[in-house]
Amino acid sequence: MLKTFSIGGVHPHENKLSAHQPIITAEVPAKAVILLGQHIGAPAKPVVAKGDVVKVGTRIAEPAGFVSAAIHSSVSGKVAKIDTIVDASGYAKPAIFIDVEGDECEETIDRSKTLVKECDLSAEEIVKKIADAGIVGLGGACFPTQVKLCPPPSFKAECVIINAVECEPYLTADHQLMLEHAEEIMVGVSILMKAVKVNKAFIGIENNKPDAIQLMTKVASSYAGIEVVPLKVKYPQGGEKQLIDAITKRQVASGALPISTGAVVQNVGTAFAVYEAVQKNKPLFERVITVTGKSVARPSNFLARIGTPMKQLIDACGGLPEDTGKVIGGGPMMGKALVNIDVPTAKGSSGILIMNRKEAKRGEAQTCIRCAKCVSACPMGLEPYLLGALSENGDFETMEKERIMDCIECGSCQFTCPANRPLLDYCRLGKGKVGAMIRARQAKK
């Protein structure tokens, strides 16, 4: 019997329209806009100024705190300005604007396709190279990888879990990455194991990707301690806590860190980026992004430079369809509608979903009918109908007591609601307000 997580979950239509589309190297943009806050934590601090000349891979911003990440130029050219731009979240964020000239790369970066298996570095040296390369979690959370690889002394890592689930509908970037770079991913997994000093790793893949399971299992057989675990298809299996539950049958307690279960979870794209950083001296300046939608002429998977305008990738797929109703950064369950399509891609950009007008139209919200479908669907064991009502009424103190901070914003509640209640919107609002309350309390101590 296939493994899966134990609480809640839903089954949205997969719509993997770009599955098995080879990864296309996107054109280098004429201008790149590289955000300074592409990760959880403090935005990076610029180390370049207007007029400076940069190459592909040049560090242009340094970490501004313990939880932060370095930023590197994805292009060669000249810094035009440091200013703000509205990003995919809809907020104005600081960014470095670069006018592209040529495509000159830093000499230390190995751009060859030669596989490098052996890694003689110590755990500490590996973590430093990962930090220097600006690696973050590529599954969406964008947590700085070097921080995750150095858990508090009171916790001990027992295994590495690689998230290759890609449960979000439409997105296929991770699937195609496994099909084209299985060997490099395995080396990356081995490096992660060495970094956290464990001898066991699990790669979780849902069984709607049989080709990836077969290939990754075959390649893993040559690497000590790595096991591919086929999983039952259920959303949101790619959630960190849900994946730990599915593979180890250990549940992360409310308010606890995932490392409390002994598991260090990394995305499969992150494992590939770790390989490139440690074995090829390549910083994180490009990633695979799916551009898709039912009306899109050519749904595709692109290897795109960070800072490429999303419009450029959309145009490479045939442009915006006439019946476009909404453009989503990410997937339909957890993604957010874009204010405009000129926003730049970032480290966390996994996909661009173009929805037609029929798909994009929301049903009119009705009064809650107390059916409890949202309660059954919630993978965190919360009561979304209650959280929604509390958020709507501004009762954020009670929301905190009802564990709103445990919400992973997966959208399962809203997906299953027959009354079309905007439950995810309410939960996001409440979570933001409660988070601000908690930070204010801590600041007074």
Indicate where each model-derived feature is located.
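N-terminal, Lys/Arg-enriched amphipathic/low-complexity engagement segments
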Residues: 1-47
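Ferredoxin-type iron-sulfur electron-transfer modules in oxidoreductases and energy-metabolism complexes
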Residues: 349-365, 375, 379-445
